[in-house]
């Protein structure tokens, strides 16, 4: 499992900044504000993403993707529980894979393996099979909301409407 301490945190902070988010590093063994799962999992409050050096990168990218994919109204009151529909959750998972390609030393292949190791569950049995063969609805959702373009590349834009 790739942890934040083994990644380029400057590149991650710059990626988050493109979306108007700030990365807040928390001291070792301290609780992570806004964490849905607790332990070392990333937390989200408004535009601030909280993590420790032992936070898995997939967790950071997942929470960032929640922020990007939610409506502005939900984003404004965000504290711990991102909410959203099942389709939005699929879009979040798809986007976190795309964002992994934006980070040196992370990449899609590594993130897909880490998502499987953590326990993400998809109909086709693993994250790669889902991403490559069963995620058209998630991709369409992201495109419809302007988060990715027609070629599947991230636009740097957040969802701006329902």
Residue ranges and their predicted role:
Residues 103-162:
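Long, well-structured alpha-helical subdomains associated
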Residues 44-47, 64:
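Active-site-flanking structural segment that lines cofactor/substrate pockets
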Residues 34, 39, 68-98, 113:
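Post-HEXXH active-site segment of zinc metalloproteases
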Residues 58-71:
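Active-site recognition of the HExxH zinc-binding catalytic motif
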Residues 49-57, 84, 88:
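Secondary-structure capping and boundary motifs in well-ordered enzyme cores
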Residues 1-43, 50-54, 98, 102-103:
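Auxiliary, metal-adjacent structural segments of Zn-dependent hydrolase domains
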């Amino acid at each position: 499992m790739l942890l934040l301490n083994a990644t380029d945190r400057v590149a991650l902070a710059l990626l988050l900044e493109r979306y108007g988010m700030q990365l807040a590093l928390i001291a070792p063994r301290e609780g992570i504000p806004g964490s849905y799962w607790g332990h070392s999992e990333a937390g989200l409050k408004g535009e601030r993403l909280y993590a420790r050096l032992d936070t898995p990168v997939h967790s950071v990218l997942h929470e960032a993707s929640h922020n990007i994919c939610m409506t502005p109204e939900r984003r404004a009151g965000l504290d711990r529980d991102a909410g959203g529909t099942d389709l939005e959750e699929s879009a979040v998972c798809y986007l976190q894979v795309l964002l992994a390609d934006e980070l040196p030393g992370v990449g899609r292949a590594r993130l897909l393996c880490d998502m499987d190791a953590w326990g993400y569950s998809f109909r086709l049995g693993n994250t790669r099979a889902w991403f490559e063969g069963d995620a058209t609805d998630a991709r369409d959702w992201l495109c419809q909301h302007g988060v990715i373009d027609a070629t599947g590349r991230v636009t740097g834009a957040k969802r701006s409407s329902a």
